């Protein structure tokens, strides 16, 4: 029988909530698995984009209009890549016959999907056009229905790249190719980590400046992953670099501590220094 619009939307939200939860836990889809995207229900309705403060940033007319994907759809699509990356990371100890720089490798396939997702993101949801930093604290809290998913999408996008290129996980993957690793590949992964890890600390700084309280524990999980990168990078002889990396680590750790009411995060930060848990986090 035909469902009324309210019931149909509730069922969509229920389905995608369960699927999103399983993806974020890195779990196999199981009973929720379906064959092909055509069999999936349409994405749930997203909140309208907040009023823009000014017109410094031009949004192209060809950005989708009424058919533009909402912020919830963007977040859900990025969660699919997160699932693939976490499963890839869990197989870090298993040797592969293909090096990650091979176009046919799992690494290259996931990286291509991540880049493809960026081409589908409407410009209005991207960092600069969204104008988060220009919104008042009151407006940010009033429009959490939009900014919550937007922040989630920002965090998972950058953390996807950080986890895929994590220096510790990558070193385990490269053990079988020590004599033939292209220098350009190592430089590329280093640049990606540097850029996208800094975006996480930049976002954390924005929350602090706007006094915007975030409550999603997944964001703490993302910050913890980035913290492990900064911690590993701090073990250098150069004092200036060491202090910079430890400062970034401390910023991530402070953010993670804002989620201690969640047991798994509480255990993570229970050590006064935090270093031991973070070094074992992955």
Question: Residue locations for each model-derived region?
Answer:
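Residues that mark the junctions of alpha-helical repeat units in TPR/alpha-solenoid scaffolds
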Residues: 15, 75, 152-154, 193, ...
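TPR repeat positional signature
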Residues: 19, 74, 156-158, 223, ...
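Eukaryotic multi-pass alpha-helical transmembrane domains
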Residues: 82, 224-227
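C-terminal substrate/ligand-recognition segments
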Residues: 153-163
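Residue at a conserved register position within TPR or TPR-like alpha-solenoid repeats
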Residues: 163-165, 230
């Amino acid at each position: 029988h035909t469902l009324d619009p309210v019931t149909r939307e509730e069922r969509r939200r229920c389905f995608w909530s369960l699927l999103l939860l399983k993806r974020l836990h890195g779990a196999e889809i199981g009973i929720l698995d379906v064959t092909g995207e055509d069999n999936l229900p349409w994405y749930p309705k997203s909140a309208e984009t907040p009023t823009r403060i000014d017109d410094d940033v031009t949004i192209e007319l060809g950005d989708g209009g009424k058919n533009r994907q909402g912020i919830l759809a963007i977040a859900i699509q990025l969660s699919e890549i997160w699932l693939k990356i976490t499963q890839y990371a869990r197989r870090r100890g298993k040797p592969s016959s293909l090096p990650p720089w091979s176009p046919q490798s799992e690494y290259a396939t996931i990286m291509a999907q991540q880049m493809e997702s960026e081409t589908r993101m409407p410009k209005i949801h991207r960092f600069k056009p969204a104008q988060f930093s220009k919104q008042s604290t009151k407006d940010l809290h009033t429009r959490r229905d939009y900014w919550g998913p937007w922040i989630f999408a920002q965090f998972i996008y950058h953390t996807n790249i950080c986890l895929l290129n994590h220096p510790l996980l990558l070193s385990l993957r490269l053990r079988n190719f020590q004599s033939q690793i292209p220098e350009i590949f190592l430089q590329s992964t280093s640049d990606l980590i540097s850029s996208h890890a800094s975006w996480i600390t930049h976002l954390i700084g924005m929350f602090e400046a706007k006094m915007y309280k975030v409550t999603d524990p997944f964001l703490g999980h993302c910050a913890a992953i980035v913290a492990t990168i900064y911690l590993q990078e701090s073990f250098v002889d150069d004092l200036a670099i060491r202090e910079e990396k430890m400062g970034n680590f401390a910023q991530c750790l402070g953010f993670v501590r804002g989620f201690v009411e969640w047991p798994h995060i509480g255990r993570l930060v229970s050590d006064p220094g935090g270093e031991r848990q973070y070094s074992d986090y992955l």
